Amino acid sequence: MTFNVLPLIQYWDQPDPPAVIADRMEGWSQHHPGWSYRRFDRTSAAVFIQEHYGADLHDAFLDIRLPAMQADVFRIAALQAQGGVWIDAATRCLAPLEGWLNLRQPLVLMRRAHQQHPKICNA
């Protein structure tokens, strides 16, 4: 797999994120000029889900009212359908991924919850 076909995927529920979020999202495409980059909002994510999974998941996605939960469902749907790198919208890119990850091997990253403070978390 080459880097330029590995999609970077981000989600913000509205078409126009707040300036600080938009700036952080833009940083990912700037640090990865040869990569495929897709930013989804609620509408474009719903279309993607409809195309890849059909009406049931599409309707369930649209019934979700919390944007963070929408992002959780869409993350799984997008990565299952096409693979790629999911990047939380609030995450700032400081350096290209090629510099610190071996992306030629299958990889899943997840941060483990602290034992005294269990929670669902993503990395």
Regions found by a protein language model. Give the residues of each.
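Substrate-binding rim/cap in mid-to-C-terminal beta-strand-loop elements of soluble/periplasmic
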Residues: 119-123
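Short, surface-exposed, polar/charged, turn-prone segments marking secondary-structure boundaries
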Residues: 35-39, 65-69, 114-116
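ATP-dependent phospho-/nucleotidyl transfer catalytic cores
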Residues: 49-67
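GT-A fold catalytic core of metal-dependent nucleotide-sugar glycosyltransferases
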Residues: 70-117
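Generic alpha-helical propensity signal that fires on short helical segments
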Residues: 26, 53-58, 104-105, 109
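N-terminal anchoring/stem segment of glycosyltransferases
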Residues: 1-55
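Secondary-structure boundary motif
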Residues: 30, 34, 63, 102-103
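Aromatic-acidic/polar surface patches that form glycan- and anion
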Residues: 14-21, 64-72
